[in-house]
């Protein structure tokens, strides 16, 4: 059962997203470090539901968009092009804090991702790629979850 209360503030939104994500590439390695903060009197609005929002510094399953939330982003990637052409991996960890639950409890959350991409190299399979994503989400007050996602991607230049 869901209860709602009409307080006349249906579109009273006050939220700004401030963030910076920098990436350093050294040979086959990439290192990323980022910070994002939601400022205002409400959570950051997501007009499309929760799709990957391009104005956040980093794509995450859970978003890190809650009112007053501060999140810290750490990314490491490796391109195996010298050993297995077409294979690359990314490891992401995000920690968010300084936000509260609907009941007013101080909360924190974290998300870890392992992403493996492989673009098939055979000429007759050109444009075909496979992707695996493992997602682990932990939250102090709420529901933790883990997901395994598999994708088959095909791209063609016209």
Identify the meaning behind each predicted range:
Residues 1-5, 26-28, 35-41, 70, ...:
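Transmembrane beta-strands of outer-membrane beta-barrel pores
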Residues 2-25, 32-34:
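A conserved active-site cap/scaffold subdomain adjacent to cofactor or substrate pockets
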Residues 5-11, 60-65, 100-107, 138-143:
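Outer-membrane beta-barrel domain signature
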Residues 14-18, 68-72, 106-112, 144-148:
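Residues that define the transmembrane beta-barrel architecture of outer-membrane proteins
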Residues 20, 29-33, 74, 87-91, ...:
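Transmembrane beta-strands of outer-membrane beta-barrel proteins
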Residues 38-104, 111-114:
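C-terminal structural cap/anchor segments
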Residues 74, 114-118, 144-158:
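Outer-membrane beta-barrel "beta-signal"
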Residues 102-136:
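C-terminal structured domain segments
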């Amino acid at each position: 059962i869901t209860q709602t209360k009409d307080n006349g503030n249906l579109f009273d939104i006050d939220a700004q997203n401030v963030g910076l994500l920098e990436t350093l590439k050294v040979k086959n390695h990439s290192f990323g470090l980022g910070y994002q903060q939601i400022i205002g009197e409400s959570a950051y609005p997501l007009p499309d539901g929760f799709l990957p929002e391009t104005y956040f510094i980093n794509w995450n399953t859970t978003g890190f968009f809650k009112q007053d939330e501060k999140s810290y982003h750490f990314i490491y990637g490796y391109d195996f092009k010298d050993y297995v052409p077409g294979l690359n991996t990314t490891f992401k960890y995000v920690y968010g804090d300084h936000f509260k639950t609907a009941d007013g409890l101080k909360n924190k959350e974290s998300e870890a991702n392992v992403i493996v991409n492989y673009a098939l190299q055979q000429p007759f399979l050109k444009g075909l790629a496979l992707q695996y994503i493992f997602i682990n989400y932990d939250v102090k007050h709420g529901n933790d979850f883990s997901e395994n996602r598999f994708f088959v991607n095909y791209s063609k230049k016209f």
